[in-house]
Curated annotation (Swiss-Prot):
Organism field: Acinetobacter baumannii (strain AYE)
Biological pathway: Metabolic intermediate biosynthesis; chorismate biosynthesis; chorismate from D-erythrose 4-phosphate and phosphoenolpyruvate: step 4/7
HAMAP family: Shikimate_DH_AroE (MF_00222)
EC numbers, comma separated: 1.1.1.25
Name of this protein: Shikimate dehydrogenase (NADP(+))
Residues where NADP(+) binds: E78, G126, A127, G128, G129, A130, N150, R151, T152, L153, A154, R155, M214, G236
């Protein structure tokens, strides 16, 4: 029987999840159908529950419903608990299960680039949900120190305080975006500047070996500046594929190879 999957969000037309999951299915022989579902801003829960009531096997959650999905789950994975957001849902024994595969997607993308994560010092620009979701997987993959920089310092400090309890083995620090300096192995842009077009200026006293832009398919001043410095860079398509592979694995027990889809 064909398994039914969907991605839910608002807006949703931009999602590439259906093409990815159908490509994984073709490669692995899983019989599935994967659709986009647009939910009204006030109608996530009813839309999600009706999908599972109709026999849906699994659902991906995108903006702006990840925090709501987290709140509705009966059972959460450790990484979802730390992220406080869920992008992957499934029903098991009548209970709604939730996971967050975004951080694992980022780690898989970085590893596919053969950028070392062991004992690294990483700078993440931005202190929003995207950053919260990737800290724990980065630490698990070997990152030694993670510095979170944000325009509003208090928000970065709050995030570090929250995560220190959840990820005690991590060396975490909060700074203001105005105080960017020092040497880092990898800089990750998790701000929405690449989406809104606000140019983010990286000062000369900030040095880094690699640059990763979480967004993809749009002009990015962050990537432009990495190019000017001749620093190896990548944008977020690999992360998108990586998080989709992890969700596919949770649902179907088969893990496609990331390199086959980049």
């Amino acid at each position: 029987m064909t398994k039914q999957f969907a991605v839910i969000g608002n807006p949703i037309e931009q999602s590439r999840s259906p093409e990815l999951h159908h490509a994984f299915a073709e490669k692995t022989g899983v019989d599935l159908n994967y659709q986009k579902r647009l939910a009204p801003l006030d109608g996530f829960e009813s839309s999600m529950r009706s999908f599972f009531a109709e026999g849906g096997s699994g659902m991906n959650v995108t903006v702006p419903f990840k925090e709501q999905a987290f709140a509705l789950c009966d059972v959460l994975t450790e990484r979802a608990q730390i992220a406080k957001a869920v992008n992957t849902l499934w029903m098991e024994n009548g209970k709604l299960h939730g996971d967050n595969t975004d951080g694992q997607g980022l780690v898989a993308a970085i590893q596919a680039l053969e950028w070392n994560l062991e004992n690294t010092t990483i700078l993440i620009l931005g202190a929003g949900g995207a950053t919260r979701g990737v800290i724990y997987p980065l630490v698990q993959a070997g990152a030694q120190k993670i510095v979170i920089a944000n325009r509003t310092l208090a928000r970065a400090e709050q995030l570090v305080d929250d995560l220190k309890t959840a990820v005690p083995q991590a060396q975490l620090q909060a700074i203001s975006l105005n105080d960017l300096e020092g040497d880092f192995d990898i800089v990750i842009n998790a701000t929405s500047t690449s989406l809104s077009g606000d140019a983010l200026q990286l000062p000369e006293k900030l040095q880094f070996k690699y640059a990763y832009e979480m967004a993809y398919g749009k002009p990015s001043s962050f990537i432009d500046q990495a190019k000017q410095r001749n620093v190896p860079y990548a944008e977020g398509f690999g992360m998108l594929v990586g998080q989709a592979i992890e969700a596919f694995y949770i649902w179907n027990g088969v893990r496609p190879q990331l390199k086959d889809f980049l």
